[in-house]
Design a protein with these regions (language model features):
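A short linear-motif detector with a strong N-terminal bias
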Residues: 5, 31-33, 40-42, 170-172, ...
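Secretory targeting and sorting signals
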Residues: 1-27
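Lectin-like carbohydrate-binding module/patch detector with strong preference for beta-trefoil
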Residues: 336-470
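Short loop/turn segments at connectors of secondary-structure elements within structured domains
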Residues: 21, 72, 117, 134, ...
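Generic detector of low-complexity/intrinsically disordered segments
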Residues: 10-11, 17, 21, 86, ...
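Carbohydrate-active catalytic/glycan-binding domains of CAZyme proteins
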Residues: 27-341
Length: 470
């Protein structure tokens, strides 16, 4: 009996020790809704705009901009996750009180790299005076812990007089670190080698695209080939992303080649994250859909994440928009959810269900408008497998929601007010709200543009009959 008790006690102690020493739970595959403003594990808006990611142990740490309402610098925030979906807020790692020159400033595109020789985490960023963009400086901060408070080292123009705006950083396999920045009023992209401690510029090693007018660089290496992904310089507005390649970081580099659609699916490059697991390494495009481009601020921005693919060793593709992206950090796989988008055409008016003014804001009431193939008239009928569908807008990534007096677009939550059934009525369909049982209806059977779309007692009238167009 005593021997059995001793064995049981040993097993309990071993289990307790294992629990104490265990790391974070193994991440499971996660599905992320694209083109939305993410939230952290406390339900707060996640502000890591223009940011970058570093992996430390089992955690991915995401750093980015958290700004004031006037877009001036407030914080650089740090979050961590094992699965790239569930992000825990860790710290405001850099604040206005970190240095006097940060009291009124713009701090943009913070990137953190780790120096194995010094044991320090080094943050590089773009710094301006908070009034205009005349300073064009790089800035540096350091910390002994990845998510601790960073000590600000100051700001400067590289090598004394080179302008420095949008930046990124990269640590090569030999431990050499580089900083890339938009220079010469954004007409050049400079590639700088950093000093051994990563806190200063050692030398300018390449200026491959003189006069190219590119910004928002992201640099990564795949199978011995360097890829530089950039955007054109059009302020907050999205534009055509392009990439170039080289087998040496100092060049020669190729000319730029288009990737993605003409607006990078309404986003701008922030970072490219390698995700390595048991099945290999995949590459995640991380972009910002800037709030300033649709009447908001930086903190209203949405995140656009897409898988990058590589048809050859020196080519890259971002060929499709996916409303959802599934990431398995354990396997190292990233896949997009393919979706067919349809218009929803009212029989009585031959007009389309439309998000007015291509708005990306929640709470916007849906109306009808002349069909024009805009993304604000395209809807993904996401089959929930329960006899109901969510209707997600292609342009906004928001879901059609029934309210007491109108139908609006809102953050997709899975609520029953966002679930709809389809009933065939001849060659048309009735779209019925799950909560009320009422049908999607053009108010007053109007044929005019901007007439409200509501829900109303199902009658089978032509203003409740719809076709799903291409």
């Amino acid at each position: 009996m005593r021997r059995a008790y001793a064995v049981l006690l040993a097993l309990v102690c071993a289990l307790a020790a294992a629990l104490v020493t265990a790391g974070p739970a193994q991440a499971a595959a996660q599905t992320i809704t694209n083109g939305t403003q993410f939230t952290d594990t406390s339900g707060n808006a996640l502000h890591a705009h223009g940011g970058g990611v570093i992996k430390v142990g089992s955690y991915y740490y995401w750093f980015g901009e958290d700004r004031n309402a006037d877009n001036t610098f407030k914080y650089v925030d740090a979050y961590r996750s094992t699965d790239l979906k569930n992000w825990e807020f860790r710290n405001h790692v850099l604040t206005q009180s970190s240095a006097s020159e940060l009291g009124t400033a713009y701090i943009e595109r913070p990137k953190v790299i780790y120096n194995a020789s010094t044991g320090k985490f080094v943050m590089w960023m773009h710094k301006e005076n908070g009034v205009d963009y005349s300073e064009a400086k790089a800035a540096v901060a350091v910390s002994s812990t990845v998510d601790g408070s960073y000590t600000y080292q100051g700001s400067f123009q590289p090598l004394g007089d080179n302008m420095s705006r949008d930046i990124t950083t990269f640590v090569d396999t030999d431990g050499t670190a580089y900083m890339v920045s938009a220079a010469n009023e954004n007409y050049d992209l400079h590639i700088y080698k950093l000093t051994a401690d990563y806190t200063a510029i050692d030398s300018l090693v390449a200026n491959p695209w003189v006069g190219g007018h590119r910004e928002a660089p992201a640099l990564f290496k795949r199978n011995g080939v360097y890829f530089m992904l950039t955007s054109a310089a059009t302020g907050w507005s999205a534009n055509q992303q392009q990439y170039a390649t080289a087998t040496s970081i100092t060049g020669p580099w190729t000319a730029f080649t288009n990737v993605g659609d003409s607006t990078a699916y309404n986003s701008q490059t922030a970072y490219v994250l390698p995700v390595t697991g048991t099945s290999g390494t995949s590459y995640l495009y991380m972009g910002d859909r800037w709030g300033n481009s649709f009447g908001g601020t930086v903190n209203d921005s949405r995140y656009v994440w897409l898988p990058l693919t590589f048809p050859t060793t020196t080519s890259m593709s971002m060929a499709s928009w996916y409303p959802e992206v599934s990431i398995d950090t354990a396997a190292g796989t990233i896949t997009g959810t393919s979706a067919t988008y349809n218009t929803l055409i009212a029989r009585n008016s031959a007009k389309c269900a439309d998000v007015p003014n291509q708005s990306l804001w929640q709470g916007i009431a849906i109306s009808q408008y002349t069909c024009n193939s805009g993304t604000n008239q395209k809807w993904w009928f996401k089959d929930l497998g329960t006899g109901y569908y969510e209707l997600m807008g292609r342009g906004s990534s928001l879901c059609l929601q029934e309210n007491s007096t109108n139908v609006t677009q809102e953050n997709c939550t899975g609520a029953t007010t966002q679930q709809w059934s389809l009933t065939t009525s001849g060659s048309y369909v009735l779209v019925k709200a799950r909560t009320s049982g009422e049908c999607l209806d053009v108010n007053g059977a109007s044929t005019a543009n901007s007439a409200a779309i509501i829900t109303y007692t199902c009658s089978g009238a032509t203003n409740q009959q719809w076709t799903r167009g291409s």
